[in-house]
Amino acid sequence: MSRRFLRIGPPIALVIIGLASLTPGLLSQNTGLPSTRNGDWPHYTADLKGTRYSPLDQINGTNFNQLEVAWRFKTDNLGPRPEYKLEGTPLAIKGVLYTTGGTRRSVVALDGKTGEVIWTHSLREGRRAAIAPRQLSGRGVSYWTDGKGDDRVIYVTTGYRLVELHAKNGAMVTSFGKDGIVDLKVGAVKGKGEAIDLETGEIGVHSTAAVVKDIVIVGSSMREGATVPTHNNTKGLVRAFDVRTGKLLWTFNTIPKPGEFGNDTWENESWAVNGNTGVWTQITVDEDLGLVYLPVETPTSDYYGGHRPGNNLFAESLVCVDLKTGQRKWYFQFVHHPLWNFDNSSAPLLLDINVNGKAIKAVASPSKQAWVYVFDRVTGQPVWPIEERPVPQSDVPGEKTSPTQPFPTKPPAYGRQYLDITKDVIDFTPELHAQGLEALKRYRVGNSPFTPPMLGDVNGILGAIGAGTATNWPGSAADPETHVVYAQAGNLPSARSLVAPPAGFSDIRYVSGLAGQQFREVLGPGDCCAADAPPRPTAPAAPPPPSGAAPNPPAAGGGGLTVQGLPIVRPPYGVLSAIDLDKGELMWQVPHGDTPDNIRTHPMLAGMTIPKTGQAGTSGVGLMVTKTVVVMGDPQITAPPGRQRGAMLRAYDKKTGQQVGAVWMPAPQSGSPMTYSVDGKQYIIVAIGGGAYSGEYLAFSLPGGGTRTTSQGQ
């Protein structure tokens, strides 16, 4: 292999090209646009509409069990230390895969048949990346072609730079921006418009840019907001750039400025002293209508909003804007005055449905709160009524909750939205049920997904129990032919508690934590682990809970609700659902994942037959849909009788939910699966990793191909 170092200013670009791999047949860029119809996977979500759907059906329910590992690619050497949270979904264009990996967020091009490295690229951004709010390898790359041989791979670095590379060899597209780079920190602000520092300013993104026609659209994200030092954080924004030149085309402010619609929903001019409210997940686009759909996150901070009275538009809203101008067309706010971290965490799904004989161009948004919100994507009108209903009110000093919240009437919730004491408490045995009820006396248990956080105390009430997380960042999938959405959901409830922060830590009155417990700063996944980041000191362990109580909820406010080491609620703990959008009805729902080992082998359950429980963490694994099956991997490692310890990649019949196949993986799924075809052979690729297993891409195919292991630097 040959190596070239390109000096491009402050960051250093490294491109490694496998010369032997540059074969004309593999890298020829023929006229025509990539499409799943041609066996490609040209977008993170397969298409611009977010469906994660491919019409390929060589691999199906009758042969899924026969899949073998065709090749594998370890990402250990794409950075100075291995990555254990590989979340990428590769793109497949004419037999070449493009994706990110490693702690330096390197871009790699791989031969789709063998996994052999064609080229790699990375930027060495130093401190700027080391302190970035969204670290590790991100979710992948984007692709653009003019159909005439100008083919580009586009990604956002850890340090928030937009970079374009020539798809053929990984070299920088020097005509884009400045020598191939647009500095996305330029234009980001906090306060009333103060520019952030280009090195230390807090902003980034780990999702892929939306690329449509000659426009590339990029969102923004800040550090996770459970225990942050200030509410006056960097403000979220969405921007569109000319894909050829890098010229800024438009900006949409997710926290409206004075004179912009929605500014008055930040009472007491609180727009000027609050931040976040970015679009950190995938953006979807209707190219024909010229409309862009922006799923907006929570403002600073996640669980306390006393410093931002009002409904806080466009926080936790779906916003539709014009592709050419960025002008708002319509919006719908899912949560008024957000306090539950119910940010819109995944791509809106664009489907053409038929309701009562009426054709509707729809947008469907799965959510953390287990509702699919469905709208006419042209007008923003809900397809079925969404009702404003009274919700519990906060008793936290300084907090002012919205008196009502939107409740969709259809489709029904596809996951557990709160803990119902009358039917949800663990009941494997009468003894465990009684212990569960006793433990819950230490919590405020509401019958609403909108039970607000409360001040928690180790010696009193530990927290308020509400919804956990249904669908998270990997997002759901949809079949554009049958109009069915396939949505995953975690089913464990969450406890949320607040505490005054230690002196000097934050200007926010209350942050996540418990009075009487050692304060712990909450770090997001991967925070501290960028290529050049120094290791953070280990936080002190929390003290044990009071005798007889359930364990203390973590500082982030989620989980921790157990009895004798078992979840405090009845199974299933993770589910996969099919939702018919023509009818607004649940077609089927099944547990996802084998029963965890700690439940299957628990001494208090000895001799009992435990039905398949599904797995916690299902909200954090993605899925894909093909002509006949839904494919999704396990979020946990298990070792049931009859197979070695590991996780399974599973296929479900689309019509019934019956599992029709499963293949073994050495680690849990950590990204989202995709599929493509090369020379008439279909492959499925999924990212795996976690725990002690570093990130790896696994490629599966039917028998007939060889198995090969590649790793950059090996």
Q: Predicted segments — roles?
A:
Residues 26-58, 402-434, 516-519, 532-553, ...:
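N-terminal pre-domain segments of enzymes
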Residues 448-455, 462-467, 562-575:
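Alpha-helix-centered segments that form part of catalytic cores
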Residues 1-15:
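Bacterial N-terminal signal peptides that target proteins for export
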Residues 30-78, 89-92, 576-577:
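Mature N-terminal segment immediately following signal peptide/propeptide cleavage
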Residues 454-455, 459-493, 498-500:
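Segments forming glycine/polar-rich beta-alpha architectures that bind adenosine-containing cofactors
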Residues 42-45, 83-102, 106, 132-161, ...:
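Repeat-blade elements of multi-bladed beta-propeller folds
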Residues 11-25:
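Bacterial N-terminal signal peptides
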